[in-house]
């Protein structure tokens, strides 16, 4: 199931870098007064076009699924979905904090209630794999699993959950509006469907999308340079697709062993020895805002995470200057939080 790095593609990209100027802007010797980007906007756009589509809100979906989305929003904030009514989806995936919550994760870690960092809930609809170990292939199965997991909502007794919701008067009209053709609308299946409807519209269009749509000024000269370096260092080999990741599984520490071997990732799902240290490649959307980084939260700073993954995954030494340049590009993947959509009930 997991895909390894495509070495042939990487070599082809390297050859292209060495023998093509990619539309580099020419600069006169000694001219240091004006910042000239190392690559033209159109040249960088052409690099990303083969695998990236512009991310934008689907107004038709928002209108068509309005009642289901509204129900999902209410459920997302409701702590009564958890066994002891202590935690909601939003407590871990804080929508006001780009869909994650480092403080909450730290608290759970101290209590030994979790061993993995909390990934962002935003832009999940465009992923092919879910969970750090890629153990789910649909958002629906991931959402249902989160409710039952002892490390998340801990509500494995779905009968108890449905009985609880049916006893809450406010939910009866919400479920009836969202599922008007269902004679028994308050069911586990409809609950999950409503949550997924809400989660699927949690997207954050960013400057990179305006850039890919043709706005040359959406990215700064520094971000253009960082984008070129992102490609030159083969980051896009794994962090590919519109979400810049979330499409494949990969061995963490493919070239140099990952320092923390306590969590073996996908191996726990398959029990296949070759799957030890296999993890899902993370989406880089909003990565600037979602520290700490990696499943083990081993990097607090984005530039450090860039250097670390390059060293262990590709065997490449990336200087601090280069890492900061890539970090500047990654800021262009930070989108706007849909404030109206995520208002608390």
Positions of predicted regions on the chain:
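Compositionally biased, low-complexity linear motifs
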Residues: 149-151, 311-313
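Post-cleavage N-terminal segment of exported redox proteins
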Residues: 2-69, 127, 150, 154-224, ...
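C-terminal substrate/ligand-recognition segments
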Residues: 280, 290, 320-323, 330-334
């Amino acid at each position: 199931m997991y895909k390894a790095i495509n070495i042939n593609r990487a070599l082809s990209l390297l050859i292209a870098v060495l023998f093509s100027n990619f539309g580099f802007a020419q600069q006169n010797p000694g001219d240091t007064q004006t910042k000239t980007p190392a690559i033209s906007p159109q040249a960088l756009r052409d690099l990303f076009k083969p695998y990236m589509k512009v991310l934008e809100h689907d107004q038709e979906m928002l209108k068509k699924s309005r009642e289901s989305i509204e129900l999902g929003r209410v459920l997302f904030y409701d702590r009564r979905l958890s066994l002891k009514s202590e935690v909601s989806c939003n407590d871990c995936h804080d929508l006001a904090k780009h869909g994650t919550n480092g403080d909450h994760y730290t608290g759970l870690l101290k209590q030994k209630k979790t061993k993995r960092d909390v990934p962002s809930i935003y832009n999940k609809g465009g992923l092919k794999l879910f969970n750090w170990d890629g153990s789910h292939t649909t958002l629906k199965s991931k959402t249902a699993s989160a409710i039952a997991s002892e490390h998340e909502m801990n509500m494995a007794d779905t009968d108890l959950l449905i009985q609880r919701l049916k006893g809450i008067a406010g939910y009866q009209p919400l479920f009836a509006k969202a599922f008007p053709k269902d004679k028994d609308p308050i069911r586990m299946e409809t609950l999950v469907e409503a949550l997924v409807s809400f989660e699927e519209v949690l997207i954050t269009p960013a400057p990179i999308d305006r850039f890919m749509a043709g706005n040359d000024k959406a990215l700064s000269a520094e971000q253009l340079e960082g984008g070129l370096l992102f490609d030159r260092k083969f980051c896009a080999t794994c962090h590919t697709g519109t979400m810049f990741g979330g499409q494949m599984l990969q061995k963490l520490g493919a070239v140099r062993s990952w320092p923390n071997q306590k969590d073996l990732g996908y191996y726990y799902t398959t029990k296949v020895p070759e799957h030890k240290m296999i993890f899902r490649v993370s989406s880089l959307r909003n990565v600037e805002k979602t520290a700490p980084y990696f499943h083990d939260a081993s990097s607090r700073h984005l530039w450090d995470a860039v250097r670390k993954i390059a060293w262990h995954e590709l065997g490449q030494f990336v200087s601090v200057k280069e890492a900061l340049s890539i970090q500047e590009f990654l800021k262009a993947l930070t989108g706007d939080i849909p404030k109206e959509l995520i208002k608390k009930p």
